[in-house]
Each structure stands twice: as C-alpha cells, then as structure tokens.
Amino acid sequence: MLAEVPKAAVVITNPTHYAVALTYRQGDTSAPRLVAKGVDSMAARIRAAAEAHGVPIVSAPPLARALWRMEPDTEIPSEHWQA
C-alpha cells in the first residue's frame, strides 16, 4: 500500500491520525480511487512518502475519516466529490 503513495494525486489527512492516498487519471478512471490508508504511525509514513515525492497533502479531517473506512483499491463514492 505504501508503495502506491508516490503515484497518488493527493493525500487527505486528519491532520495527524489518519491519512488516505487517492489516485485519479481523468479519462482513464471514472472516479478517484483509494490506493493507501493508514492511522497513527502508518499515517505518518504515508505523509512522509507524499512529502518526499511531491504529492499534495490536504487537511480535511471529516473526509479523511470517511475515506479511511473504505477498502483499498476502491472508487470514491460521488458524495465525497467536490467541484
């Protein structure tokens, strides 16, 4: 899972306890996909990997917690999208 973070489009955090990495390729996928998730020490590792590879990190606590409940490699439901 951690190996997917450098390929992520964004990492959403809560800001210290939860982290989820999402990927999205417009035209290739119908929705963003959850590719990595972690809590506490794994969340810190995801944030560190994102920083090391220039992946944007966004603090959005309610969204991070909601997405963390999802299984890896699943599409993000449209209710979590924002234009």
Residue ranges and their predicted role:
Residues 1-83:
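Divalent-cation
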